[in-house]
Amino acid sequence: MTKKPDPASRIADNKKAAHDYFLEERYEAGMVLHGWEVKALRAGKAQLTDGYVLIRDGELFLLGCQLQALKTASTHVSPEAARTKKLLLKKDDIRRLIGKVEQKGYTLVPLNLHWKNGVVKCEIALARGKAQHDKRNSIKEREGKREVERALKSRSR
């Protein structure tokens, strides 16, 4: 059996989310998973880049998250890589998120999957979409910070 991961280790990150959205509020949600999905997560076979969170009947669901089944997965279960996964949050948090998502321009995006006390958690964020010029501005700011850091580093030598 594989070694259990560190309690706070990350499984997968959604780097595209920070580029495409203004992240406003973050939440940590539990996930309802099948056994083969947990094994795939332990092996690090997860991808969040196309994932998004959908609200249906007062519950949160993670869609578009790819979990590739291991070759040693059970023969009597047919694993589906893009299966919809239910997210677990407190009722008050879900109500608050429903109210904000119904406002124009807000959506829920998954940021990362990580282990916490032997359980898989999904960090989600309430986000607003960035326009193209906002993306360009954030790239310019990031490059400006890099240049300043380079200048300070070379000056200190």
From Swiss-Prot:
Gene3D superfamilies in the record: 2.40.280.10
Compartments, as annotated in UniProt: Cytoplasm
InterPro entries tied to this protein: SmpB (IPR023620), SsrA-bd_prot (IPR000037), SsrA-bd_prot_CS (IPR020081)
GO CC terms, sorted: cytosol
Entries under CDD domains matching the protein: SmpB
PANTHER family documented for this protein: SSRA-BINDING PROTEIN, TMRNA-BINDING COMPONENT OF TRANS-TRANSLATION TAGGING COMPLEX
Family: Belongs to the SmpB family.
Protein name: SsrA-binding protein
Organism: Verminephrobacter eiseniae (strain EF01-2)
